[in-house]
Design a protein with these regions (language model features):
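N-terminal signal peptide c-region/cleavage motif recognized by signal peptidases
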Residues: 21-23
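Bacterial N-terminal signal peptides
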Residues: 10-19
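A short, acidic, amphipathic alpha-helical segment used as a generic capping/interface helix at domain edges
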Residues: 133-143
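Glycine-rich phosphate-binding loop signature in dinucleotide/nucleotide-binding domains
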Residues: 84-86, 141-148
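Generic beta-sheet signal
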Residues: 36-38, 146-154
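Short, well-ordered beta-to-alpha junction loops that form the rim of enzyme active sites
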Residues: 93-96, 153-157
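N-terminal secretory signal peptides that target proteins for export/translocation
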Residues: 1-5
């Protein structure tokens, strides 16, 4: 193959990759504006497991919180989302500080605390009730037809209960729902590295 043919081949391959990336980027933004999708997100990296005994949901100092890496990770996720064309969003968060801090660090809009996004790790008997409340929250927000993407910051147990899959800290899940806010399908977007 001549040098010119190699350069043409490289150019064509690069152009195809650029087009595919642009389409994927447009697809995420378009999906989040179609009234059938939300972005579920697990909080960024918070070292440890669960919360310390006797924690108080109203006192961040008593909870498991974001570490330095988690704070950088949350900012990187916000940058990645802006790179996908999401510059402003409706953001809802669990009352746990590791979620609300992640939500704030995304820097995509104000954050509203919603109890259905709170962890039920300490009381698994709440799984069905909170999952139903999450579906109602999603339905209610999508019914408003604001066209702003909806981002829901929550925990491992909540995401697993809603869609049946485990995700890592900082991972995002594009979830398609029916008119009642119930899960249909999903695509996982791994957290970008800071």
């Amino acid at each position: 193959m001549s040098c010119v043919n190699k350069k043409i081949s490289i150019f064509i391959i690069s152009l195809i990759c650029l087009l595919i990336t642009s389409q994927a980027k447009a697809a995420l933004v378009d999906d989040l504006k179609d009234g059938q999708h939300v972005l579920l997100m697990r909080h960024a990296d918070a070292p440890g497991y669960g919360d310390p005994a006797g924690y108080d949901i109203g006192l961040c100092s008593t909870q498991r919180n974001l570490g330095d890496y988690g704070k950088k990770q949350a900012k990187a996720i916000g940058s990645w989302l802006r790179g996908q064309g999401i510059n402003k969003a409706q953001i809802f968060s669990s009352p746990w500080c590791r979620c609300s801090d992640t939500a704030q660090l995304l820097d995509l809009g104000s954050v509203k605390i919603e109890t259905p996004l709170g962890s039920f790790f300490d009381d698994m008997s709440l799984e069905k009730k909170q999952t139903k409340e999450l579906e109602q929250l999603i339905k209610s927000e999508l019914d408003k037809q604001s066209k702003l993407p909806i981002i829901l910051l929550t925990h491992h147990v909540n995401i697993r209960a809603f869609m049946g899959k485990n995700v890592s800290q900082g991972d995002m899940v594009l979830v398609k729902v029916n008119k009642n806010g119930e899960y249909i399908s999903h695509v996982i977007y791994p957290s970008p590295k800071p």
